[in-house]
A protein has these predicted regions:
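Detector for small/aliphatic-rich hydrophobic stretches
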Residues: 4-163
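Composition- and surface-driven signal marking solvent-exposed, interaction-prone regions
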Residues: 211-213, 265, 274-280, 363-364, ...
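Extracytoplasmic/secreted cell-surface and envelope-processing proteins
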Residues: 96-102, 271-274, 306-308, 359-360, ...
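Non-catalytic, conformational "gating/processing" segments within enzyme and secreted inhibitor domains
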Residues: 27-33, 73, 114-268, 288-370
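Short amphipathic beta-strand starts and helix->beta connectors
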Residues: 70-75, 246-248, 280-283
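Short Gly/aromatic-enriched secondary-structure transition segments
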Residues: 102-104, 212-219, 275-285
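Extended hydrophobic
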Residues: 198, 249-265, 371-405
Length: 405
């Protein structure tokens, strides 16, 4: 019987400041967690400078994941970057067909993906952290090569712990600390056959270049996918970058510093149909093709939270062996006795007059076994929201917005 890896991907997008991350090692309440990276130093990554290939791979993966995770008429918020970080670490322990399926879904060979992720430099607006917790009962002999790869390319910490209530507390505290306390309880329980947790946490805090003034905000109505009405605080502004293709219109709204933008995309038809027909190339072309045309933009304030299980969505992307007895994750412990059981994803997103603040956490639970016509975009019915990294051309967060709360 294989030891089961239940891959728990929880992503929370939260509007709120990102405080500085703690640097001290995590010790559980009994003080018995062991820092497995104590004798491992992250090595400089050669040629970690080109994120061009990662842009295409990440956008393709993001749209494909959204298609398979979204439910008709329901709001879903995802951090594909967080999911890819967790799967990237996993791929460093995968071999054979399991690795090939991961590489195909992620859009890059793992060696290239590792270097591309290492080239992405977080800043004051966007922070990313990774950590691994292994069961400290002698059931796993963790590969030093696996730990080295996670340290080199993902900056991961790693701990051996007793996997009792104190370990659950440690993991939850780590996630809370790295998401500015926006995800206080990542794990409700530790499964009795859990052998490893791979955890990613993201935090995004983007302030608008020009915050909305009080006279640009009013009480309005948002019409959900089923035609019902929600009271909404609507925010109006004139933006300079207009989005338009045969299927949608929208706008780009920049955050201070210039690196990130919010892309708000309003389909000509239903959001469900638009998402199902969308692909990565079309999304990149729409955003890259933004025109210097003024647009009167109306954006609702948002308070969103979604929770979903992503194992089926990842299977739909061709990642099958990872979840059954065919899994080969022998790069983690030298044995072919690990597989992935579940992938949980939780996300929270808030947009207001000051900007967008987001946090994300991914946990892999490894168990035993000029004068021109002004355009107008009124976002008073379902639309697609993207937080876009203009520097690396990466989608940091996506949301299919079918409601404002």
């Amino acid at each position: 019987m294989k030891k089961l890896i239940a891959l728990l991907l929880l992503t929370a997008l939260v509007l709120g400041g990102c405080a500085a991350s703690p640097a001290a090692p995590i010790l559980n309440a009994a003080g018995v967690s062991v820092n497995l990276m104590a004798n491992i130093t992250a090595k400089p990554v050669a040629d970690a400078s080109d994120t061009g290939s990662l842009s295409k791979a990440a956008t393709d993966f993001s749209v494909a994941l959204l298609k398979n995770a979204a439910e008709s008429g329901k709001t879903v918020v995802l951090s594909p970057y967080s999911v890819m970080q967790a799967l990237g670490m996993t791929a460093n322990g995968a071999k054979g067909e399991t690795l090939q399926q991961l590489e195909l879904a992620l859009g890059m060979p793992i060696a290239e993906l590792n270097k591309a992720f290492a080239a992405v430099q977080p800043d004051s607006a966007f922070r990313n952290a990774n950590a691994l917790w292994f069961r400290d009962d002698g059931s796993l002999e963790v590969s030093s090569d696996f730990l080295q790869a996670c340290a080199d390319y993902y900056g991961a910490d790693a701990y051996a712990a007793p996997f009792d209530e104190s370990t659950r507390t440690d993991i939850n505290q780590w996630v809370s600390d790295h998401t500015d306390q926006r995800i206080p309880e990542m794990l409700k329980e530790l499964r009795s056959n859990a052998a490893l947790y791979l955890v990613n946490a993201l935090c995004f805090d983007g302030k608008w270049v020009e915050p909305y003034s009080e006279d640009a905000i009013w009480d309005g109505v948002f019409y959900t996918a089923d035609g019902s009405e929600q009271n909404a605080r609507m925010m109006s502004s004139e933006e300079a970058l207009y989005l338009k293709d045969d299927s949608a219109t929208g706008f780009l709204k920049p955050y201070a510093g210039g690196r990130y933008s919010l892309a708000a995309i309003l389909p000509n038809g239903s959001l469900d149909d638009y998402v199902q027909k969308l692909d990565g190339d079309a999304l990149r072309a729409l955003i890259d093709g933004a025109s210097d045309d003024p647009v009167q933009a109306v954006l609702p304030q948002l308070e969103l939270k979604s929770d979903c299980e992503l194992a089926d969505a990842l299977r739909a992307l061709g990642i099958n062996d990872l979840f059954d007895d065919s899994a080969d994750l022998s790069g983690i412990d030298g044995k072919q006795d690990l597989s992935v059981g579940r992938v949980l994803h939780s996300a929270v997103l808030r947009v207001d007059e000051n900007g967008t603040e987001a946090a994300a956490s991914t946990v892999e639970e490894i168990e035993m076994m000029g004068l021109r016509e002004t355009n107008s975009v009124l976002l008073d019915h379902p639309f697609l929201l993207v937080i876009w990294d203009n520097q690396t051309q990466l989608p940091v967060f996506l949301a299919a917005v079918n409601s404002v709360r």
